[in-house]
Amino acid sequence: MRRITEKLHITKVYVEDAEKLIPKLGGDVQIVSAECWEAVAFAALLALRSFERGTNHARTLGGELLIRLAGTLQIKDAIAQNGIKNGENYLVVFGTRERALELLREFGLNELPLTGCDEEKVKTFFEKAALAEVL
C-alpha cells in the first residue's frame, strides 16, 4: 500500500467480481482500472485539490477521481474507461491507512505489487488528468 498523503492511500488489488463491489464504492472509496499507480495518485491528488478549491465537477471524491483519471467530464465515459473491472485494479481510499486496511478485509481483496510506468507514459497520464482542469 502506498501512502500518498496522510489521508490518501492507494494499493493494487485483484478483483474477481466487480459487480459485487460496485454498490460499496463512492464517496471516499473508489476502485479504478489504470496502467500504473502514478496516474491514479496524480488524479486522486487533483480530485482532492478540486474539492478544496470548490472547482470539482463530480459530487464525490470517487467520482472526481474517475473524471480526472479519464480526462473527461462525462462520468459515463470515465466509468467505461477507468471504472472497476474484473482483474487488476487500484483501490483508492481518501482516508487513513487503517481505513484502507479495513476496506481490503471488508471487500475480500488481496494486495498486489504496485506497477509503475515509464517516465514518458507517466507524463501522458498527467496531461490527461490535468485536462479536466481546462474543460
Where do the protein language model's features map onto the residues?
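Generic detector of well-ordered alpha-helical segments enriched in charged/polar residues
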Residues: 19, 23, 42-45, 76-79, ...
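Ordered, amphipathic secondary-structure segments that act as subunit-interaction surfaces
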Residues: 37-95
